[in-house]
From Swiss-Prot:
Protein name per UniProt: ATP synthase subunit a
GO CC annotation, single: plasma membrane
Matches recorded under Gene3D superfamilies: ATP synthase, F0 complex, subunit A (1.20.120.220)
InterPro entries reported in the protein's UniProt record: ATP_syn_F0_a_bact/chloroplast, ATP_synth_F0_asu, ATP_synth_F0_asu_AS, F0_ATP_A_sf
Length: 273
């Protein structure tokens, strides 16, 4: 797929598929894509926003409608799937979270399904939606997998980080949270600076590792799909099907890991020392 009608070489093709649709504000107006190269931090990846919010709304609508139509008799396939997800995540939350908080199970379910749906977009053929958007809407760049955008995974993990800090302060108080940062692992006033550095690094590493793990796995998977798409048609079929089947495991596993680590981190935040 080319942005101006000419064929792209392999390097340009890869770069094209790894470029987000951007929007920014310049000189009081709105600019897109290449015009946003110097906009810096204030650049919106509108494709990531569109697909992540859209998939979040789809998740809420789907589960809400299923709940409205739930019957006591023989459930349909969709109701069975929703009930399996809800009951499974609820069981995991009860086994992994050792405090008392009614928010944890719904939060874990939301994270798992939302991240799973965003990851699932990676199974759509790499040229299918971008080519349609370019041909019919004139959109030259489009990344359809939100979790291949570090901004999305960092946004998710920073939200978890805020909850970790909030519940740590709520459970221990400001004084207890401060002591946790300054008097562990060495309980002596002279080692407060060392403790603070060690505990701060440990705390900050949680959202960073969450974000990079999810981003790295999905970005690598998307890159492999792009490389397969550059091959002859017979090689594409021979390689894309096995990789897609294997990638289903990665999609589910990464959503599960993100959910589990969120539960574990919040459980640790509720513990009183």
């Amino acid at each position: 797929m080319a942005t101006t009608g000419e064929a792209l070489n392999a390097s340009e093709y890869i770069q094209h598929h790894l470029t987000n649709a951007k929007m920014c504000s310049t000189d009081g107006g709105v600019a897109f894509n290449h015009a946003c190269q110097d906009a810096g931090f204030w650049t919106w990846h509108i494709d990531s926003l569109l697909f992540s919010v859209g998939l979040g709304v789809l998740f809420l609508w789907l589960f809400y409608k299923t709940g409205q139509k739930a019957t006591a008799g023989v459930p349909g396939k969709l109701q069975c799937f929703v009930e399996m997800c809800v009951e499974g995540v609820d069981k995991i939350a009860k086994e992994s979270f050792h405090g008392k908080n009614v928010v944890i199970a719904p939060l874990a379910l939301t994270i798992f399904i939302w991240v799973f749906l965003m990851n699932f977009m990676d199974l759509i053929p790499v040229d299918f939606i971008p080519e349609a958007a370019n041909r019919f809407l004139g959109v030259p760049y489009l990344k359809v997998v939100p979790t291949t955008d570090l901004n999305v995974t960092l946004g998710l993990s920073l939200s978890v980080f805020v909850l970790i800090v909030f519940y740590s302060i709520k459970a221990k108080g400001i004084g207890g949270f401060t002591k946790e940062l300054t008097l562990q692992p060495f309980n002596h006033w002279s080692l407060i600076p060392v403790n603070f550095i060690l505990e701060s690094v440990t705390l900050i590493a949680k959202p960073i590792s969450l974000a990079l793990r999810l981003f790295g796995n999905l970005y690598a998977g998307e890159l492999i799909f792009i490389l397969i798409a550059l091959m002859p048609w017979w090689a594409q079929f021979a390689l894309s099907v096995p990789w897609a089947i294997f990638h289903i495991l990665i999609i589910v596993l990464q959503a599960f890991i993100f959910m589990m680590l969120t539960i574990v981190y919040l459980s640790m935040a509720h513990e009183e020392h």
